């Protein structure tokens, strides 16, 4: 009798347990899955793969979000409450060469299409930042400044200053770009002052004469004001492109850290203040391998007060240098202002992985911008004043055929520029460096952007955790993925 009662009690308890499981546990599990689906029903996934079958292509979410898999060993935890830097923008340089190709080589209908593909968020990649050479760089149709003079002549009053060269095709394109993307910011950087200001009496080589510091500061003021008359605000400048390198074949100039500090504190900063110019001044604008340059400039307290931050290039050193400088000078901005694609890292696979590394690691090391180099070059990697060019633009415009080809650089930049808006804040996420790297942002409209790069030859499944929600995402080998949701 007792055994029968015990069996009945045991059976009853089993029935209760099973009922509890189906009614409560399974119900809660289904509710969680339903909530995840509801919370991420506006999830967008954009993919690029090295086989080029997907080039910044929007995907069906259901093909990549995996619901019935075990928790991945790759757990990407995103914390929107832990915030870092505010982003300024993403883009490249509309060099003289690039502007010439777009304005002079392409027919009007193709030109409009290319501009939309570059600057429009919906039809293109939404470039929101341009770094413009002040005068000729290595990628120009000729060597020129805004105040060229005959040999042994000077113009200390800048009576011959003119931006007419830029008015022909650079400024009209800048205006069109600004119409397409209202958030576009423009910074400017000289490769060289006019030759008469230098010891070489030439835009190639040399350094700035000490008695030309004042007129060179006024040259910046004149440039900013003349562009303003054209309806173009110059958001920021640097005093010199790559001041530690003096190129033998194109405009350039040596400027030591001590010289730059002297120029900023006694000439450029006061000239901006006197003329009520709000344009930001950033120092350096060269590679990560010499952080001492920035430290030396910043040690000058008078120069320091005029400087908004430092600008960095990718050709030597490591991204972590920017974090080092941020930690030493947390009140100063960090900008990543030049990374060119080229034959030294061939497309597609090697260049793709290299550039996605910059897209992710630069912001993770406090950079507020990600900026490639030439927007457009031709089939010979020009126009250029160089005897030989190995650089690659975002776009190739063939002068003979008028054909337009979008290079790997276009798609890598697009993974961030199309989705992360100016004013977005980088938010915390853990990364798996050299494996499954990522960076996360919170846009001004409260949408979240997660950029993932799978640097390995194997597909991965990662668990993305955001607040109290999570989902599993499949990432193909050697691929980049941008995810967006609200």
List the predicted regions and their residue ranges.
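Carbohydrate-binding surface patches
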Residues: 418, 429-467, 478
């Amino acid at each position: 009798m007792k055994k029968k009662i015990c069996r009945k009690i045991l059976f009853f308890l089993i029935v209760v347990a099973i009922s509890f499981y189906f009614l409560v546990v399974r119900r809660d599990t289904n509710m969680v899955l339903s909530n995840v689906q509801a919370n991420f029903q506006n999830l967008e996934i954009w993919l690029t793969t090295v086989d080029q079958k997907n080039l910044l292509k929007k995907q069906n979410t259901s093909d990549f979000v995996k619901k019935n898999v075990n928790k991945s060993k790759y757990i990407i935890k995103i914390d929107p409450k832990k915030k870092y830097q505010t982003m300024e923008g993403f883009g490249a340089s509309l060099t003289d060469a690039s502007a010439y190709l777009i304005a002079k080589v392409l027919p009007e209908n193709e030109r409009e299409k290319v501009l939309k593909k570059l600057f429009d968020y919906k039809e293109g990649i939404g470039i929101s930042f341009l770094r413009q050479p002040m005068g000729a760089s290595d990628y120009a149709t000729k060597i020129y400044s805004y105040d060229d003079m005959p040999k042994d002549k000077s113009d200390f009053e800048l009576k011959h200053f003119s931006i007419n060269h830029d008015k022909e095709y650079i400024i009209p394109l800048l205006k069109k770009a600004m119409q397409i993307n209202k958030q576009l910011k423009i910074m400017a950087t000289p490769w060289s002052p006019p030759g008469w200001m230098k010891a070489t009496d030439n835009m190639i080589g040399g350094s700035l004469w000490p008695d030309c510091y004042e007129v060179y500061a006024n040259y910046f003021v004149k440039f900013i004001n003349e562009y303003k008359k054209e309806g173009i605000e110059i958001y920021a400048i640097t005093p010199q492109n790559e001041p530690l390198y003096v190129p033998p074949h194109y405009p350039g100039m040596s400027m030591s850290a001590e010289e730059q500090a002297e120029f900023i504190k006694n000439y450029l900063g006061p000239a901006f203040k006197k003329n009520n110019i709000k344009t930001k001044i950033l120092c350096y604008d060269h590679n990560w391998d010499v952080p001492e340059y920035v430290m030396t400039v910043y040690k000058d307290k008078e120069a320091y007060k005029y400087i908004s931050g430092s600008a960095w290039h990718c050709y030597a050193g490591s991204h972590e240098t920017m974090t080092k400088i941020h930690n030493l000078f947390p009140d100063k901005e960090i900008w990543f202002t030049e990374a060119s694609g080229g034959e030294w890292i061939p497309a597609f696979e090697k260049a793709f992985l290299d550039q996605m590394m910059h897209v992710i690691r630069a912001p993770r090391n406090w950079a507020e911008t990600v900026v490639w180099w030439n927007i457009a070059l031709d089939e010979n990697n020009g126009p250029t004043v160089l005897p030989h060019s190995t650089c690659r633009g975002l776009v190739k415009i063939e002068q003979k055929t008028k054909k337009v080809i979008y290079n790997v650089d276009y798609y890598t930049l697009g993974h961030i520029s199309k989705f992360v808006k100016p004013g977005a804040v980088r938010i915390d996420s853990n990364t798996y460096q050299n494996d499954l790297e990522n960076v996360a942002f919170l846009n001004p409209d409260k949408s979240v952007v997660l950029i993932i790069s799978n640097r390995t030859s194997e597909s991965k499944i990662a668990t993305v955790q955001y607040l109290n929600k999570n989902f599993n995402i499949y990432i193909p080998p050697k691929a980049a993925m941008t995810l967006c949701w609200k």
